[in-house]
């Protein structure tokens, strides 16, 4: 009985994937690609223009942005590249 219970617990943990983290890109503008592990389930890419040209910011989550900033949120690994 204990073996069956232990097996069920292990199967549940594997199926729920409790330790899952999402991988998001976090390089800025045209810098070489870098990634980070995120606890949440989304990545973002913010794009805007200023006196320097087009600026791109990437990271974890899906933040609120001011008007004039384009925001793309996505939900798969490295989807914000």
UniProtKB/Swiss-Prot annotation:
Disulfide bonds join 24-43, 38-60, 62-73, 74-79. The keyword Disulfide bond applies. The keyword Signal applies. Gene3D superfamilies: CD59. CDD domains: TFP_snake_toxin. GO terms for molecular function: acetylcholine receptor inhibitor activity; ion channel regulator activity; toxin activity. Keywords: Acetylcholine receptor inhibiting toxin, Disulfide bond, Ion channel impairing toxin, Neurotoxin, Postsynaptic neurotoxin, Secreted, Signal, Toxin. SUPFAM superfamilies: Snake toxin-like. It is found in: Secreted. GO terms for cellular component: extracellular region. Residues 1-21 form the signal peptide. Expressed by the venom gland. InterPro entries: Snake_3FTx, Snake_toxin-like_sf, Snake_toxin_con_site, Toxin_cobra-type. Binds to muscle nicotinic acetylcholine receptor (nAChR) and inhibit acetylcholine from binding to the receptor, thereby impairing neuromuscular transmission. Belongs to the three-finger toxin family. Short-chain subfamily. Type I alpha-neurotoxin sub-subfamily. This is Short neurotoxin 2. It comes from Hydrophis peronii. The lineage of its organism: Eukaryota, Metazoa, Chordata, Craniata, Vertebrata.
């Amino acid at each position: 009985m204990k073996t069956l219970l232990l097996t069920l617990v292990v199967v549940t943990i594997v199926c729920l994937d409790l330790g899952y983290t999402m991988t998001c890109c976090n390089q800025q503008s045209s810098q070489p690609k870098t990634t980070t592990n995120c606890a949440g389930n989304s990545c973002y890419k913010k794009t805007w223009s200023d006196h320097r040209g087009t600026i791109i910011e990437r990271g974890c989550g899906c933040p609120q942005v001011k008007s004039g900033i384009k925001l793309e949120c996505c939900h798969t690994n490295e989807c914000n590249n």
